Amino acid sequence: MIEKRNIFLVGPMGAGKSTIGRQLAQQLSMEFFDSDKEIERCTGADISWIFDLEGEQGFRYREEILINQLTEKKGIVLATGGGSIKSKETRNVLSARGVVIYLETSIEKQLIRTQRDKKRPLLQSVGQCPQFFQTLAKERNPLYEEIADIIIPTEDHSFKIVAKKIIHLLEKP
């Protein structure tokens, strides 16, 4: 059986962090948190409203504080926001307090998975622009890789299969 260590999922929007995170938590009998949902719960406001009011910098500050608090818990699965790794402090905290799993996916798959999502603030202004996703990937992928203990492609498999693969990898000594 897997010891109850924290599992932190990082990766771009549309990689499946929330869906896979819920499945992992359920299968491993762990508590699940989604940093975006927790910010909304704590503030009573949705993320796009926070972005409108405080800008990305204000949102990232809130996110950094929340992730620091959540990662102090034991035995959790945490799905982080795609841009959370922009903060050096957040990268350090994630690396130090659990197993970081980078859910990797292609820009094409991101476009498909996010096409109907109206709740992502960064997509509100640019829509489904491949160049936007390419810019984010160029900026963020090296940061995901920097802190990843495990890299899992989510491209060609169902999220259920990806969750099973992660559990299998975590069970290895």
From Swiss-Prot:
Free-text comment on the cofactor: Binds 1 Mg(2+) ion per subunit.
Biological processes, Gene Ontology terms: amino acid biosynthetic process; aromatic amino acid family biosynthetic process; chorismate biosynthetic process
Enzyme kind, highest EC tier: transferase
Needed co-factor(s): Mg(2+)
Domain of life: Bacteria
Binding site for ATP: 14-19, 120
Location relative to the cell: Cytoplasm
EC number(s) per entry: 2.7.1.71
Reactions mediated catalytically: shikimate + ATP = 3-phosphoshikimate + ADP + H(+)
GO cellular-component term (any): cytosol
Disulfide links within the chain: none
Residues where substrate binds: 36, 60, 82, 140
Pathway: Metabolic intermediate biosynthesis; chorismate biosynthesis; chorismate from D-erythrose 4-phosphate and phosphoenolpyruvate: step 5/7
Pfam families to which the protein is assigned, alphabetical: SKI
Transmembrane segments: none
InterPro entries according to UniProt: P-loop_NTPase, Shikimate/glucono_kinase, Shikimate_kinase/TSH1, Shikimate_kinase_CS
Quaternary assembly: Monomer.
Similarity annotation: Belongs to the shikimate kinase family.
The protein's role, per its UniProt record: Catalyzes the specific phosphorylation of the 3-hydroxyl group of shikimic acid using ATP as a cosubstrate.
Protein name: Shikimate kinase 1
Native species: Hamiltonella defensa subsp. Acyrthosiphon pisum (strain 5AT)
